[in-house]
Amino acid sequence: MSYRKLGRPSDQRRAMLRNLVTDFLRYERITTTEARAKEVRKIAEKMITLGKRGDLHARRQALAYILDESVVKKLFDDIAPRYKERNGGYTRIFKLGPRRGDGAPLAVIELV
């Protein structure tokens, strides 16, 4: 399984992605770098698929990754039912251009 290292040790990378996924599911739209957005998309799609399953085991798996219990509740009660007829492709990434300061390519990731 391939993944992006994002210039961080594994524990910092995992913590950063957990924070980004939690914020993405809370606000349904975030601005970040392209590489981070692509990694967030992979994880967020899996979380939404867990939400669509809707059983206790899926809820516990989501709670193990998502940092905030209220976000898990939103995922299972609000977000997942929206996509019950859709098989994947729950997110969309728009490229914004370079970030002022360091020139990193920015992107917006949002729910479809």
Curated annotation (Swiss-Prot):
PROSITE patterns: RIBOSOMAL_L17 (PS01167)
Claim: Metal-binding is one of the keywords in the record: no
Keyword Ribosomal protein in annotation: yes
GO molecular function, one term: structural constituent of ribosome
UniProt GO cellular component terms: cytosolic large ribosomal subunit
Alphabetical UniProt keywords: Ribonucleoprotein, Ribosomal protein
Record InterPro entries: Ribosomal_bL17, Ribosomal_bL17_CS, Ribosomal_bL17_sf
GO biological process, one term: translation
Entries under SUPFAM superfamilies matching the protein: Prokaryotic ribosomal protein L17
Similarity comment: family membership: Belongs to the bacterial ribosomal protein bL17 family.
Oligomer status and interactors: Part of the 50S ribosomal subunit. Contacts protein L32.
Protein name: Large ribosomal subunit protein bL17
Organism (species): Caldanaerobacter subterraneus subsp. tengcongensis (strain DSM 15242 / JCM 11007 / NBRC 100824 / MB4)
The gene coding this protein: rplQ
